[in-house]
């Protein structure tokens, strides 16, 4: 198993697919990382040489990923909540933020139905 940014990558996958298992790296960024590291995107991870893996580590290290990115996102949400702005209030109440209707939908965000006591 190749280990990049603290994540074990599945050896049977192509490099650009395997890199997407790192939080903060999606399709576009994984292709950019492969291009910058001079690694063919359709190479299987098991076929990578040690210098190629090291080049990938260096390129991935240039981005904010994994724990740092999770912390940044959490701090941004906490800042919105502390500001008492509309988005912060919606986060605090666990409701949709972007204008979606909540009268009939939004069950995922609101959680399971709560029985009404008569």
Swiss-Prot record:
GO cellular component, one term: small ribosomal subunit
InterPro entries for the chain: Rbsml_uS13_C, Ribosomal_uS13, Ribosomal_uS13-like_H2TH, Ribosomal_uS13_bac-type, Ribosomal_uS13_CS
UniProt-recorded Gene Ontology molecular function terms: rRNA binding; structural constituent of ribosome; tRNA binding
Region (Disordered): 99-118
Keywords: Ribonucleoprotein, Ribosomal protein, RNA-binding, rRNA-binding, tRNA-binding
Keyword hit for Ribonucleoprotein: yes
Top-level taxonomic group: Bacteria
GO BP, sorted A to Z: translation
NCBIfam families associated with the record: uS13_bact (TIGR03631)
Protein task: Located at the top of the head of the 30S subunit, it contacts several helices of the 16S rRNA. In the 70S ribosome it contacts the 23S rRNA (bridge B1a) and protein L5 of the 50S subunit (bridge B1b), connecting the 2 subunits; these bridges are implicated in subunit movement. Contacts the tRNAs in the A and P-sites.
Family: Belongs to the universal ribosomal protein uS13 family.
Subunit structure: Part of the 30S ribosomal subunit. Forms a loose heterodimer with protein S19. Forms two bridges to the 50S subunit in the 70S ribosome.
Name of the protein this chain belongs to: Small ribosomal subunit protein uS13
Organism: Xylella fastidiosa (strain M12)
């Amino acid at each position: 198993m190749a280990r990049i940014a603290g994540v074990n990558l599945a050896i049977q996958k192509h490099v650009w697919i395997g890199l997407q298992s790192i939080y903060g790296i999606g399709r576009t960024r994984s292709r950019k990382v492969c291009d910058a590291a001079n690694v063919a995107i359709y190479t299987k991870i098991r076929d990578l040489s040690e210098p190629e893996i090291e080049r990938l580590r260096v390129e991935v290290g240039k981005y904010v990923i994994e724990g740092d990115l999770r912390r940044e996102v959490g701090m941004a949400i906490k800042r919105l909540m502390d500001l008492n702005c509309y988005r912060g209030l919606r986060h605090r109440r666990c409701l949709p933020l972007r204008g979606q209707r909540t009268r009939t939908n939004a069950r995922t965000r609101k959680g399971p139905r709560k029985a009404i006591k008569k």
